[in-house]
Amino acid sequence: MTTQKKQAVTIKGTKDGLTFHLDDRCSFDSIVGELAEKLSSKHYQMEDQPRIQVKVDVGYRYLTVEQKRHIQELITDGRNLDVEEFVSQVMTKEEAEEKRKEAQIVSVAKVIRSGQVFSVDGDLLLIGDVNPGGTIRASGNIFVIGSLRGIAHAGYKGNGEAVIATSHMAPAQLRIGEQIFHWSKEEQQAGDRIMECAYIASDTNEIQLDRVQKLLKIRPNLATFLDEMVEQ
């Protein structure tokens, strides 16, 4: 009885193209050798055929830039294959640090004055006012226990799920992700709108204003922040 040799490389077709699974328990040299052998088939050597997108799943393996380049060249050179992405379950130190920053909550008690820009990674809880001409930015959500009269930009790295909530809403401008909401002079002169929030509505993909309590329905995970704001 012969034992079937475990494959270092498995190629599977998907609706979007091909997925190359590279066994993370095999040596890199074994993977390169088997990959070259499988790609030697004439099936993968038709440059004049439509391009096929390839996803390379490396599992719990960390690949250096040079190793990725080597695998990418092996897959694409002389073939109708394009590497779309490498998928790994391992994060680099830089990626882990970035993820930590995005998950953090920065609490600050201060007044943002005209001309000042205050920016953080993660969520921002500001206890104080944002005066006209002042700007606050966060890669996550923004909560202001005070008056927001300047500019607030939540999700400034492209997070359209971020929200803005404030005790007193009368900003010059609101931004969430790539969306912008301009506050009219008439609205500013009408006075503060108490305990309001801003978020991107899923049906219109535009910034919508509502009572802070609305966030309990659309973002229930923010209940702790909202309870603190209401108590203030």
From Swiss-Prot:
Keywords: Cell cycle, Cell division, Septation
Listed GO biological process terms: cell morphogenesis; division septum assembly; regulation of cell septum assembly
Keyword Cell cycle set for record: yes
Protein family: Belongs to the MinC family.
Biological function: Cell division inhibitor that blocks the formation of polar Z ring septums. Rapidly oscillates between the poles of the cell to destabilize FtsZ filaments that have formed before they mature into polar Z rings. Prevents FtsZ polymerization.
Subunit structure: Interacts with MinD and FtsZ.
Name used for this protein in its record: Probable septum site-determining protein MinC
